[in-house]
Amino acid sequence: MEDGEIEEGMVTADEFPTPEVTTIETIQPPREPGKSPLELLRESKTSVEEIVAKMLSMKKQGNHKSEIRELLTQMFLNFVNLRQANRAILTEEDKVKAETERAKAPVDFTTLQLHNLMYEKSHYVKAIKACRDFKSKYPDIDLVPEQDFFRHAPEAIKDQSLSSDSSHVLMPKRLNFELHQRKELCKHRARLEQQKKSLLETIAERKKFLSSLPLHLKSLKKASLPVQNHLGIQHTKKLKQHNLAELLPPPLYVLYSQLLAQKEAFEESIELEVVGSLKDAQAYARQQSRKDSGMSSNTESSRLEDDGPDDDDDGQRRRKRPKKLTSKEGSDKAGLYQVHPLKIVLHIYDDEIPDTKSLKLVILKFEYLLKLNVVCVGAEGSQDGPEKNIFCNLFPDDAGLEPPHQSTKLILGDGQTFDENRTSRPYKWVQHLAGIDISPVLLGQEAHNTDPAKSDTFVPDLSLYRQQHRVQTVLRRIRLRKKAHLALAEQLDLLMKHELPVVNCEDAPWALHKVLCALDSWLHIQSSASKSCSLTLNSVEQVPEPMEIDVDGRSISGKEDFESIREDGELPSLVTAAASLTSSNHTPSKVSNQARSRQLALMTKNLDSPISKGKSPSFKKYEDDLDLVLDDDSEIDEPTGRTEAHVEELCPEKADNSWVDYGSREFALVFSRKTDGGKLWKLEAMVQISMEYPLRPPLFSLSLHASSSSGNENGTNESDHYNELRAMEAEVNLHMLKIIPSDQENYLLSHQIRCLAMLFDYYVDDPSPDSKRGTATTVVDVGLCKPVDGKLLVRSFRGRDHRKMISWKGRGCASGYPC
């Protein structure tokens, strides 16, 4: 808007309309008496907005200047109305404030009265609480209950009006009864004092008689020796054993006391005796006492010499430096395995037979190494190698070769193990029985880990055993291990004679199956004790890549051959573990067995028996671990090769699982079967039997070969039967374990061999041609609990195979199953 226009449209006081223009003012009606100031304010505001809008529109058009003046006049009138409404609102506000001030006075008065009442109430509450908390002395007086008072109080103290008396009247009467009772007790005490004097005189006379008894008892003991030997009481022998036990070193004494307490408290089927030279033990005890007294005197004298000033050195204090050991003394290892003269011999009997002398399972000999400060145990009279050492891996990661604590490692030297030629070894559980607690040793990278949630991983598995019944747990495991090895030896003897062991189990289908194949050979190949017991991380990293590319860009890996044979994702659970059977130069037992044993190491670490099924909480963990292994293996999609960081993250324990294979034995099993067409099938199995049998089941690695009647190979390749062999391995190594009852766990090897023979018979009897074996569903694929009635069902879809192989969840055979 231009300035000229503004000046032209301004309205001054001289230009206010004359009385003739009052007709325009009458357009806006005055304030109606029924309207409130707020409504008048709103109407005036709305009218002003409308007038301003009209003036702006006329100003833009440039004409109707007379109308603009009229609108301006109306707007001023609205301003007057606005001021009038504002004045009315302020007047009403003052009126409301005055009314509020008048109403505030009674409210303040009422509030003051309320505060006074609340203060008075709090005063009364405090007074009531003080009265209630008041304690008098009479409740602390130890009086007889009221019922006893009414029952036993004499009539002189109580009267007939007691039922209506108040508690205040009753209390003095109860106090009088208490005084009466105490007087009676004082009289009774005087009588007891008289009896005590007479009894003391009698005791003195009997002590004189007892002092003369040892001479009579000594002569009586000598006379009773023939009777003791005849009755088998051996009381004198027990006293001698206790006297010998006093000369035992502290670790052996703790071991002896624990075993003896277990026998006496729970009637354990064991016998204890301390053997050795008594004179040598006494001489060693005197030598140790003189050595200890000499060390204490030398310590005191050296302390005095160190505290006294030297005259030649102007009173300056001089300390003695310890003498350095010569290299000859430091390198002398001849006396490291020096044994204490006394040993503990433990006879363990079968606890399932009532007569303890009917069957002696094993004899243990405990000895103490003086220089190494460890307790060793071994089977008495046993000169066998580690493959027959029943104490090897009695608990996880305890082969007996590693020094049990750090001081022993320092004495033996870095990287040195215990002498393997010794039959007795320092197992960790023996140290715990002897009271020698072993602290866990942290590695370099573990020492910097301060996470308390991960601190439990550093504690050895034997710490769980420390919180349980030590002696009972060890004896039970030794009995189970010995019985299992006796049953295993019986089965191995039959297999060496090329005879299949007989199993007695009605629930197992292979027990009722008539074996058609023949056992050609059973040979003992080697023992894993001769191998190295260490598995470095480099060996874990040297897993073959799924495919390698040569200079020409061609694949030179063997895994592609297997991938081309099977369908996409079919049976992926065992492909990686068994791919090295044909692609590497190692034997199947050397490669696949190690891979599978590491998978099974998790399952049997803290189990009492893998075949106890629902009878113990440990079997639930075993079934969970089986599912864990199958689920983990079934998801192998990425390449087998891993980076170093990935291996260290996912496999931190694989480098320490070499103890699993220590002491295990490997056998070669060959089944043969000749078909009607003149074709000869041979199923070769590498069987690895662990020292923890049957806790850790035997591991089977299979390979299949076929030849014609003329003896020539017919061109069959193991990859043609790859899926079936892996399914058989999974069945024999994992799934069939669920159906074996607990009373047959020691004959697990027989069940596995019988099951393998049955699967081999079914596979050979399969009428499908060789070209369709890899693409057809056989009895091996779908499981033995739901047979396919001898028919071959071709898969109707491609893609990853999510079938669960040979499930044994149902024990009953379906109709048509060839049991």
Curated annotation (Swiss-Prot):
Location of the region described as Disordered in the Swiss-Prot/TrEMBL record: 285-332
Protein name: THO complex subunit 5B
Any single biological process term in GO: mRNA transport
Family: Belongs to the THOC5 family.
Entry function: Acts as a component of the THO subcomplex of the TREX complex which is thought to couple mRNA transcription, processing and nuclear export.
One GO cellular component term noted in the UniProt record for this chain: THO complex
Subunit structure: Component of the THO complex, which is composed of THO1, THO2, THO3, THO5, THO6 and THO7.
Organism per entry: Arabidopsis thaliana (Mouse-ear cress)
GO terms for MF: RNA binding
UniProt KW keywords: mRNA processing, mRNA splicing, mRNA transport, Nucleus, RNA-binding, Transport
Subcellular location(s) per record: Nucleus
InterPro entries: THO_Thoc5 (IPR019163)
Keyword Zinc-finger: no
